């Protein structure tokens, strides 16, 4: 939490970290999360790292610890049709901005993974590999990933046949086969070329 502590010492705390999950998927929502940690209140959370480097079981365990110990946590869904309408970059920024606003605690500074979050009323900084070097961004990465995985597992029951619980909406070989067999569902992002190809195949 070196970056967070430095900002707090400069009078810019509390510091929120934000990140998303599902940007590269061709189905399902993008989920954006924001987290404010407070190690003075509840101690440091061991094991925080980029969610992509952790097993599903480890992410779930850390999610529960984050929810218990963080000063504030929020996440929002940006649905597939909104991703199509806005484009992924703007959908990403919009989701992160909403997640920060919904924290319930106004941060003094916001750190994000990769690029800054335009439109905030507080200063912010996009950090290269922020989910690997900032504890609050890593925590947001884990929250976003776990929340989205749970959404995709539930979606698998609501829209059977696509195996959403397995591939989580990403364009794996299995998902591509299901798209070819069934065509797109209402949860697919029509702005993606592989989804449009499947739609054309099933409209001919």
From Swiss-Prot:
PROSITE patterns referenced in this protein's UniProt entry, alphabetically: RNASE_H_2
Keyword flag Metal-binding: yes
Domain spans labelled RNase H type-2: 13-204
Cofactor(s) required for function per UniProt: Mn(2+); Mg(2+)
Keywords, ordered alphabetically: Cytoplasm, Endonuclease, Hydrolase, Manganese, Metal-binding, Nuclease
GO CC terms, sorted: cytoplasm; ribonuclease H2 complex
Entries under Gene3D superfamilies matching the protein: Ribonuclease H-like superfamily/Ribonuclease H
InterPro entries named among the record's database cross-references: RNase_HII, RNase_HII/HIII, RNase_HII/HIII_dom, RNaseH-like_sf, RNaseH_sf
Predominant location: cytoplasm
One GO process term, biological-process aspect: DNA replication, removal of RNA primer
Annotated compartments: Cytoplasm
Enzyme Commission number(s) of this protein: 3.1.26.4
The reaction(s) this protein catalyses: Endonucleolytic cleavage to 5'-phosphomonoester
SUPFAM superfamilies in the cross-refs: Ribonuclease H-like (SSF53098)
NCBIfam families: PRK00015.1-3, PRK00015.2-2
Record's function text: Endonuclease that specifically degrades the RNA of RNA-DNA hybrids.
Family: Belongs to the RNase HII family.
Name of this protein: Ribonuclease HII
Upper classification of the organism: Bacteria, Bacillati, Actinomycetota, Actinomycetes, Propionibacteriales
The gene coding this protein: rnhB
